[in-house]
From Swiss-Prot:
Site (Transition state stabilizer): E159
Entry's Gene Ontology cellular component terms: cytosol
Name the UniProt record assigns to this protein: Pyridoxine 5'-phosphate synthase
Membership in a protein family: Belongs to the PNP synthase family.
Subcellular compartments: Cytoplasm
Biological process per Gene Ontology, one example term: pyridoxine biosynthetic process
InterPro entries recorded: Aldolase_TIM, PyrdxlP_synth_PdxJ, Pyridoxine-5'_phos_synth
Binding site for 1-deoxy-D-xylulose 5-phosphate: D17, H18, R53, H58, T108
CDD domains: PNPsynthase
Organism: Cupriavidus metallidurans (strain ATCC 43123 / DSM 2839 / NBRC 102507 / CH34)
Transferase listed as a keyword: yes
Phylogenetic placement of the source organism: Bacteria, Pseudomonadati, Pseudomonadota, Betaproteobacteria, Burkholderiales
Catalytic residues (positions): H51, E78, H199
């Protein structure tokens, strides 16, 4: 049975990358990211997100191929704009592909895609994926120029990078980054885009972001994997989904930069 708490209020995409990281750390076949994905669906995940990196540091090609036909919800495949990755995506045909920047030396994705600076390349990738029947999302910073460029690329979806909000060291810095994200959501909607968000969100900073009414979906992975060490995998997924839904439905949480 798949559990859904208030379906349609706000979607949770559970990223399974770091289940694969744990598997690969010892070169074993466990923990199985496929099993993690299916159990996440049962616990209320609205989609499964996974990033096939060029160096295959966590998710592998076989994981993507094995998972695609087993999902009851939908697959959101993150990948870089390379001919290899685009060809793999067009072969496997996930429901969604989120195009992300990628550097081999980074620990995790460090910022948004520079759509404005690589407009022709991004546009071509969007066309290739759309022609294959795949919905395209662009992972970008909450920057007006990048949002406008994403709309011009004919990408129907953007995912706003929340890393700077999540990594803020002071209350003032976090409040400023929250305002940037909120403004980015509003700008995306004005361009007619579906607006998602993610990166660095966890159990004590997700509430203000989840409360923003213009956000359709949040993609969260590392925090859920980490919390599962103590709470159990399905409990961790259920708890995150419940927090997000409560925030969207009006439960009062502190908003960065506003009085409690």
């Amino acid at each position: 049975m798949i559990f859904h708490a208030n379906p349609g209020v706000i979607d949770l995409g559970v990223n399974i990358d770091h289940v694969a990281t744990l598997r690969n750390a010892r070169g074993t076949v466990y923990p199985d990211p496929i099993q993690a994905a299916l159990q996440a669906e049962e616990a209320g995940a609205d989609l499964i997100t996974l990033h096939l990196r060029e160096d295959r540091r966590h998710i592998r090609d076989a994981d993507v191929r094995a998972l695609r036909p087993k999902l009851a919800t939908r697959m959101n495949l993150e990948c870089a704009i390379t001919s290899e990755m685009l060809d793999i995506a067009c072969e496997i045909k996930p429901q969604d592909v989120c195009l992300v920047p990628e550097k081999r030396e980074e620990v995790t994705t460090e910022g948004g895609l520079d759509v404005a600076g690589h407009f022709e390349q991004v546009s071509a990738a969007c066309r290739q994926l759309a022609d294959a029947g795949i919905r395209v999302s662009l992972f970008i910073d909450a920057d007006p120029d990048q949002i406008a460029a994403a709309a011009a690329c004919k990408a129907p979806v953007i995912e706003i990078h929340t890393g700077r909000y999540a990594d803020a060291h002071t209350a003032e810095e976090q409040a400023a980054e929250f305002r940037r994200v909120a403004a980015g959501v509003e700008a995306g909607q004005k361009h007619g885009l579906i607006v998602n968000a993610g990166h660095g969100l966890h159990y004590t900073n997700v509430q203000p972001i989840a409360a923003l009414p213009g956000i359709k979906e949040l993609n969260i992975g590392h925090a859920i994997v980490a919390h599962a060490v103590f709470a159990g995998w399905q409990n961790a997924v259920r708890e995150m989904k419940a927090i997000m839904v409560a925030a969207r439905l009006g439960t009062r949480y502190p908003v960065p930069g506003q009085p409690a």
